[in-house]
Amino acid sequence: VERWQSHQLRCPKDLDELLRGFRPLFAYHDHLLEGREIPLATVEEFFKTGAVSQFSGDPKDLMLLQGQRNCYEYLRERVLARDDLETSLVLEVHRILTSGTYTEPFYLVNGERPGDYVTAVNAVGAAARDVGRELDHLVEEVSGYCGSELLQVAAYFHCRFENIHPFAAGNGATGRMLMNYFL
């Protein structure tokens, strides 16, 4: 964490250079954690060019990769400005990451959309009526923390976020993206 914080990032290009190899690796492993397989070379090509060649996989994988790219673009200026974590940022990160991927009928029937809290009764997470309050409390709890236990606080944030499970889908990817943003 200290090494990361020691970098003198003055402009978006500095951050892009620093994270050049990290971004595709993060997206690749994020896909694996979600049970989706896409070759690392394809992910690297997509992050380098914004397109892929020789791809015959699930188009949803490309939508998810595009969400990762768009989310990085959205967060880049906020990382440079060292903006605190806010609930509105959580909602926007989720909206960007999952844009175009809420296609299953039960999401649509329940009126659930990317960037909106869960509305249906789920077997996991906080009750739908409590999600906003619990997420606000979590964000207040960790926002602005800059002490010596940053990694532990980031892990705590991720664990509590997943426990709240604020969205119908995309909680894992959103939580991992926000944990990295927090660090």
Where are these regions (language model features)?
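FIC/Doc superfamily catalytic core
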Residues: 1-183
